[in-house]
């Protein structure tokens, strides 16, 4: 039982850590490519900015899904019921 809970805690840490790391890398690439595009064609900067914010919103959804899965494993672990029964 304790092993299952400790592995769940490790899994939660990995899920949250990798989701945060992936999002940070994604935002860095997105910002860099936006600046490249805006520097190359300054007249396209407003349209690129709108698209960048849309993609940033979609990119931000990934760690939110990871946090929800981590909260599921933290507070309502589905594997504990199989162990008890």
Curated annotation (Swiss-Prot):
Q: Which GO terms describe its molecular function?
A: lipid binding; proton-transporting ATP synthase activity, rotational mechanism
Which cellular components does GO assign to this protein?
Answer: plasma membrane; proton-transporting ATP synthase complex; proton-transporting two-sector ATPase complex, proton-transporting domain
User: Quick one: where is this thing mainly located?
Assistant: membrane
Q: Which UniProt keywords apply?
A: ATP synthesis, Cell inner membrane, Cell membrane, CF(0), Hydrogen ion transport, Ion transport, Lipid-binding, Membrane, Transmembrane, Transmembrane helix, Transport
- Gene3D superfamilies, sorted: F1F0 ATP synthase subunit C
Q: Does the keyword Ion transport apply?
A: yes
Q: Which residues cross the membrane?
A: 10-30, 53-73
Give the membrane topology, semicolon-separated if more than one.
Multi-pass membrane protein
InterPro entries xref list: ATP_synth_csu_bac/chlpt (IPR005953), ATP_synth_F0_csu (IPR000454), ATP_synth_F0_csu_DDCD_BS (IPR020537), ATP_synth_F0_csu_sf (IPR038662), ATPase_proteolipid_c-like_dom (IPR002379), F/V-ATP_Csub_sf (IPR035921)
- Domain of life here? Bacteria
**Keyword rRNA processing tagged:** no
User: Which family is this sequence assigned to?
Assistant: Belongs to the ATPase C chain family.
The entry describes its oligomerization and partners as: F-type ATPases have 2 components, F(1) - the catalytic core - and F(0) - the membrane proton channel. F(1) has five subunits: alpha(3), beta(3), gamma(1), delta(1), epsilon(1). F(0) has three main subunits: a(1), b(2) and c(10-14). The alpha and beta chains form an alternating ring which encloses part of the gamma chain. F(1) is attached to F(0) by a central stalk formed by the gamma and epsilon chains, while a peripheral stalk is formed by the delta and b chains.
Describe the function of this protein. F(1)F(0) ATP synthase produces ATP from ADP in the presence of a proton or sodium gradient. F-type ATPases consist of two structural domains, F(1) containing the extramembraneous catalytic core and F(0) containing the membrane proton channel, linked together by a central stalk and a peripheral stalk. During catalysis, ATP synthesis in the catalytic domain of F(1) is coupled via a rotary mechanism of the central stalk subunits to proton translocation. Key component of the F(0) channel; it plays a direct role in translocation across the membrane. A homomeric c-ring of between 10-14 subunits forms the central stalk rotor element with the F(1) delta and epsilon subunits.
Q: What is this protein called?
A: ATP synthase subunit c
Provide the species name: Aliivibrio salmonicida (strain LFI1238)
Lineage from the top down?
Bacteria, Pseudomonadati, Pseudomonadota, Gammaproteobacteria, Vibrionales
């Amino acid at each position: 039982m304790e092993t299952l809970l400790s592995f769940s805690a490790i899994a939660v840490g990995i899920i949250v850590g990798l989701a945060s790391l992936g999002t940070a890398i994604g935002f860095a690439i997105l910002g860099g490519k936006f600046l490249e595009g805006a520097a190359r064609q300054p007249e396209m900067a407003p349209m690129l900015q709108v698209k960048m914010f849309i993609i940033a919103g979609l990119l931000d959804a990934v760690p939110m899904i990871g946090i929800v899965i981590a909260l599921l494993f933290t507070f309502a672990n589905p594997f504990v019921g199989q162990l008890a029964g």
